[in-house]
Curated annotation (Swiss-Prot):
It holds the Pfam family IMS_HHH_1. This is DNA polymerase IV. Monomer. Residues 4-185 form the UmuC domain. GO terms for molecular function: damaged DNA binding; DNA-directed DNA polymerase activity; magnesium ion binding. Belongs to the DNA polymerase type-Y family. Mg(2+) binds at D8, D103. The active site is at E104.
C-alpha cells in the first residue's frame, strides 16, 4: 500500500506578499489586477475570502464584494524562488515528487524510513520545515491514493492536515461529494446531479455501463474514484502540455477588426514563450480563446503539426461567429504540445508575407 502526501501551500502568492510586506497582514489582499485596469485575481488571502473574493474572479467584481481590497501585482520570480526552496525540502524526504504548480505537489513517501515510515509524521515534519525556512504555512493530505490525498489536503486548511488511513477509504468515499473529485466542475456536477448523482455512494449504486455510455472515458474514471480506486503513480517528470498567452482587455471590444488588432502582440509573445519553453517539441494543435462580457468563454482549435499565423486569424474568425452580440473581454492564443515520444523535429512555423512574425 502506497503512502501519498499532497502538500498545498496556503494562499501562496498572497502569503508571500504578507510575509515580505507585513503591513498587508490582517487586511483583505489579492494578487493580480488593478483598480484602473481590468484583470483577474490570481489568489487572495483568507481575509478577502470572507467577503466572497476568489481566485480567477474578475477584479472589478472582487472590488464590488470588497471595496477595501488591496490589489498588488504578482512577483512571479519571487514565487518561483520560494517554490524552489520548498521543493528542496521535499527532496529530503523522497525523490518521488510530482509538482502540480508552484504551490502544490504530490509526494510518495512509501520508502521513506524517517519517523519509522509514518506518513503522518513525515507530513508534519515537512510542514514544520516549510514554516521554519520560508515563513509560510502549508496544508497536507495523507492517503494511500493520489486523488484522496488531494481531497484531504483541503479539509483542514489553513495550516492543517488530514489523514485518510487505508482501512477508512471505503467509508470515506461514500459520503464524498462528486464536486470534490478532480475533473468534476460545475457543468459536469450539474449533469451528474440531474441523474441523481451527488455523492460517490450514488455512483456506486448506478449502472457502470450507463455512466460510461453517457460520459465516455471520464465515466469509467468516475466509477473508479467513487470506489476509492486511483492507480496513478507519481509522475516525476511532468511534461508541459501547452504554451499560451492571453490578455484581459481594458475595455470590451465587439468587432473582428478590433480583435485582429490585438492578435500581433499575442502571437509575438507566444513566439517568445515557445522559444523559452517548447524545447524543440512538436505541436499538435493551435487554439484561440475568447471570453465574453457575460464571463462565458469559447475556444476553437485546429489540429496541426506546425504553427501557422494565418490559422490563428482563421480560428479567431470562427470564434467570433459565436459572439452573439456580446462584448469580448479576454483574447488568448495557444498551442498544444505533443508528447516527447512524438517529437519528430523542432517547431516549424509557416511564415507569411502579410505577417512578419518569426517563431
Amino acid at each position: 500500500m502506497r503512502k501519498i502526501i499532497h502538500i498545498d501551500m496556503d494562499c501562496y502568492f498572497a502569503a508571500v506578499e504578507m510575509r515580505d510586506f507585513p503591513e498587508y497582514r490582517g487586511k483583505p489582499l489579492a494578487v493580480g489586477g488593478s483598480r484602473v485596469q481590468r484583470g483577474v485575481i490570481s489568489t487572495c488571502n483568507y481575509e478577502a475570502r470572507k467577503f466572497g473574493v476568489r481566485s480567477a474572479m474578475a477584479t472589478g467584481y472582487a472590488l464590488k464584494l470588497c471595496p477595501n481590497l488591496i490589489l498588488v501585482p504578482g512577483r512571479m520570480q519571487v514565487y518561483k524562488e520560494v517554490s524552489q526552496q520548498i521543493r528542496a525540502i521535499f527532496s529530503r524526504y523522497t525523490e518521488l515528487i510530482e509538482p502540480l504548480s508552484l504551490d502544490e505537489a504530490y509526494l510518495d513517501v512509501s520508502d521513506c524510513k524517517l519517523f519509522k515510515g509514518s506518513a503522518t509524521l513525515i507530513a508534519e515534519a515537512i510542514r514544520r520545515d516549510i514554516l521554519a525556512e520560508t515563513g509560510l504555512t502549508a496544508s497536507a493530505g495523507v492517503a494511500p491514493i493520489k486523488f484522496l490525498a488531494k481531497v484531504a489536503s483541503d479539509l483542514n486548511k489553513p495550516n492543517g492536515q488530514c489523514v485518510i488511513p487505508p482501512d477508512e477509504v471505503p467509508e470515506f468515499v461514500k459520503s464524498l461529494s462528486l464536486r470534490k473529485i478532480p475533473g468534476v466542475g460545475k457543468v459536469t456536477a450539474e449533469k451528474l446531479s440531474s441523474l441523481g448523482l451527488n455523492t460517490c455512494a450514488d455512483v456506486q449504486a448506478y449502472p457502470k455501463q450507463e455512466l460510461i455510455a453517457r460520459f465516455g472515458k471520464f465515466g469509467a474514471v468516475l466509477v473508479e474514484r467513487a470506489h476509492g480506486i486511483d492507480e496513478r503513480g507519481i509522475s516525476v517528470s511532468r511534461e508541459r502540455k501547452s504554451v499560451g498567452v492571453e490578455t484581459t482587455l481594458a475595455q470590451d471590444i465587439y468587432t473582428l477588426e478590433q480583435c485582429q488588432q490585438v492578435m500581433p502582440g499575442l502571437i509575438q509573445e507566444l513566439s517568445s514563450r515557445l522559444v523559452r519553453s517548447a524545447k524543440g517539441r512538436q505541436i499538435h494543435k493551435q487554439v484561440v480563446k475568447l471570453k465574453f462580457n457575460d464571463f462565458k468563454q469559447t475556444t476553437i482549435e485546429h489540429r496541426s503539426d506546425e504553427v501557422s499565423v494565418v490559422m490563428f486569424y482563421e480560428l479567431l474568425s470562427q470564434a467570433m461567429a459565436r459572439q452573439e452580440g456580446r462584448g469580448i473581454r479576454l483574447l488568448g492564443v495557444s498551442v498544444g504540445l505533443a508528447e516527447t515520444k512524438d517529437t519528430l523535429s523542432p517547431l516549424m512555423v509557416r511564415e507569411t508575407k502579410q505577417l512578419d512574425f518569426v517563431f
